[in-house]
Regions:
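Conserved N-terminal beta1-alpha1 strand-loop-helix module at the mouth
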Residues: 1-89, 94-110, 114-120
Length: 120
């Protein structure tokens, strides 16, 4: 589906340098951005996501929100990525709808088998 996905991170891509990274990303062949800031307040993540969504539309990039299905839905992101300890996949699918992208983490063989059995 994606050739290159850029994943933001609290430590590797701090907010203070995010604009610099995004300028490069928007001009590159990266086709997906995963918004993954685990330590941001909800309102700050929402505002960042809302602004990033506008830029993603402008530059034809896909936006995925990590862990926060509620934020993904509220900013009309292309989808969300959830882990085994987050909102269950089936609930994320109900909230985001059939057309949204939903990624699921699998950290070991048993989790991979569970993810592989998911439908929808």
């Amino acid at each position: 589906m994606f050739k290159f996905c850029f994943v933001t991170d609290d430590k590797l891509t701090p907010l203070s340098k995010l604009d610099n990274y995004l300028k490069i990303i928007f001009e590159s062949k990266v086709d997906c951005i995963q918004l993954r800031f685990k330590n941001l307040k909800t309102i700050d993540l929402y505002n960042l996501g809302k602004d990033l969504k506008k830029d993603c539309v402008k530059f034809k990039k896909t936006l995925i929100v990590n862990d926060r299905v509620d934020i993904a839905k509220s900013i009309n992101a292309h989808g969300a990525h959830v882990g085994m300890d987050d909102l269950p996949y089936n609930q994320a699918r109900k909230i985001l709808g059939r057309k949204s992208i939903i990624g699921v983490s699998a950290s070991n063989k048993n989790e991979f088998i569970k993810v592989k059995k998911l439908k929808g």
